[in-house]
């Protein structure tokens, strides 16, 4: 017996099952279903209900007892409200169950099983309209890059013939918050397809020059649409003022321009003080006036007492003779 017992296989331990993740609403409903029911279809008046915290109290009409109510206990909520809630002073119908700390409400509805009105502080659901977006047409089966709507595709599947001069479908602009400034969208595919068609036509048929009427009307299929350029802003041309010629010398003569290329003058300092320039200009004018007076005054030589002419030449190079005294005047004695 001992050998038989030793040969028996040992039991393999089974792995423990992982706990299921449950939503709070489903878990609360299951807990309420497992709780003991004290009364059913009891009517009462909502004493107060906090929408943010999600709980409140209901005063029973029969026993005047306050019953705790949670937002998960509301069975039929207002379809226009985003959150489950009951309004203050609203008459509701509910079941009373035994909770951990006392009586609790369950399966809360309006009187007669209608949805509750809800609290005025509860947010309403967002009103939106359902928009039916057209699916983008497949570009592989298109000819000439023309977009076809689903309605036109259904008609084309029946007849498989559409008008050749059908305008391409325009894409709807994006919403305002998706738009970007200075953003250029992708080029339409009809240009590439048109270029392929033009090459095929040129191979099959003889090239024919477009007439002047076609060019004037703008129906040339080979000519792509003109591109729109935005002209850049350029600063207007403002010529610089000519440099003023500075006078040299006190006689007001300006410097004559030589035939040779003059050397460029060094750039002046723009931040020189104004007083310093006035002082330099005053000193230059004083020196120029002194030089001019020295040139204008001739040299004067005194006449000799004997009346002989002076041999010293003047600036002009001609000798200057002194006038002889009058004999009558010289012989007369001076009065005493």
From Swiss-Prot:
Start and end residues of each stretch annotated as Disordered: 1-22, 103-336
Main location: cytoplasm
Keyword check for Transcription regulation: yes
Cleavable signal peptide: none
PROSITE patterns: CSD_1, CSD_2
GO biological process, one term: regulation of gene expression
A single GO molecular function term of this UniProt record: RNA binding
Bias kind Basic residues: ranges: 123-134, 168-186, 225-238, 269-281
Posttranslational mods: Phosphorylation activates in vitro RNA binding.
Biased composition (Low complexity): 282-292
Compartmental location: Cytoplasm
GO cellular component labels: cytoplasm; nucleus; ribonucleoprotein complex
InterPro entries the UniProt entry points to: Cold_shock_domain, CSD, CSD_CS, CSP_DNA-bd, NA-bd_OB-fold
Key words of the record: Cytoplasm, DNA-binding, Phosphoprotein, Ribonucleoprotein, RNA-binding, Transcription, Transcription regulation
SUPFAM superfamilies reported for this sequence: Nucleic acid-binding proteins (SSF50249)
Reported tissue expression: In adults, expression is restricted to the ovary and testis.
Domain CSD: 44-108
Highest taxon in the source lineage: Eukaryota
UniProt biased composition (Basic and acidic residues): 252-268
Keyword Transcription recorded: yes
Oligomeric and partner information: Possibly forms a heterodimer with p54 in the 6S and 15S mRNA-binding particles. The principle component of multiple messenger ribonucleoprotein (mRNP) complexes. Component of a ribonucleoprotein (RNP) complex, composed at least of elavl1/elrA and/or elavl2/elrB, igf2bp3/vg1RBP, ddx6/Xp54, ybx2/frgy2, lsm14b/rap55b and, in a subset of RNP complexes, stau1/staufen. Component of a ribonucleoprotein (RNP) complex, at least composed of lsm14a/rap55a, ybx2/frgy2, ddx6/Xp54 and eif4enif1/4E-T. Does not appear to directly bind lsm14a/rap55a.
Functional summary from the UniProt entry: Has a dual function in oocytes: as a DNA-binding protein, binds to the Y-box sequence (CTGATTGGCCAA) in the promoters of target genes to stimulate transcription. May also function at CCAAT-containing promoters that lack the consensus Y-box sequence. Also binds mRNA to promote accumulation of the transcripts it contributes to produce.
Stored PANTHER family: COLD SHOCK DOMAIN CONTAINING PROTEINS
Protein name: Y-box-binding protein 2-A
Lineage of the organism: Eukaryota, Metazoa, Chordata, Craniata, Vertebrata
């Amino acid at each position: 017996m001992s050998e038989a017992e030793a040969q028996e296989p040992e039991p393999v331990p089974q792995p423990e099952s992982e706990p299921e993740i449950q939503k709070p609403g489903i878990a609360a409903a299951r807990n309420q279903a497992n709780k003991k029911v004290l009364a059913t279809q009891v009517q009462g008046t909502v004493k107060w209900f906090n929408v943010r915290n999600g709980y409140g109290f209901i005063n029973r009409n029969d026993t005047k007892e306050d019953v705790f109510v949670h937002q998960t206990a509301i069975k039929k909520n207002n379809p226009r409200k985003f959150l489950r809630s009951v309004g203050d002073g609203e008459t509701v119908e509910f079941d009373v169950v035994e909770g951990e700390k006392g009586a609790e409400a369950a399966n809360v509805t309006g009187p007669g099983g209608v949805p509750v009105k809800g609290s005025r502080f509860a947010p309403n659901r967002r009103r939106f309209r359902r928009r039916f977006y057209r699916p983008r047409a497949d570009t592989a089966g298109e000819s000439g890059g023309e977009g076809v709507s689903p309605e036109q595709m259904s008609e084309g599947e029946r007849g498989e013939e559409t008008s050749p001069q059908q305008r391409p479908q325009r894409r709807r602009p994006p919403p305002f918050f998706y738009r970007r400034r200075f953003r250029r969208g992708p080029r339409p595919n009809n240009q590439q397809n048109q270029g392929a068609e033009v090459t095929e036509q040129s191979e099959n048929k003889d090239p024919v020059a477009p007439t002047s009427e076609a060019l004037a009307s703008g129906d040339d299929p080979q000519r792509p649409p003109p591109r729109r350029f935005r002209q850049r802003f350029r600063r207007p041309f403002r010529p610089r003022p000519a440099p003023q010629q500075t006078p040299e010398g006190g006689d007001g003569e300006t410097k004559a321009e030589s035939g040779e290329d003059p050397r460029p003058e060094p750039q002046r300092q723009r931040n020189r003080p104004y007083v310093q320039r006035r002082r330099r200009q005053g000193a230059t004018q004083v020196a120029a006036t002194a030089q001019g007076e020295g040139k204008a005054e001739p040299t004067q030589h005194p006449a000799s007492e004997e009346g002989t002419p002076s041999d010293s030449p003047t600036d002009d190079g001609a000798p200057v003779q002194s006038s002889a005294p009058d004999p009558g005047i010289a012989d007369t004695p001076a009065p005493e």
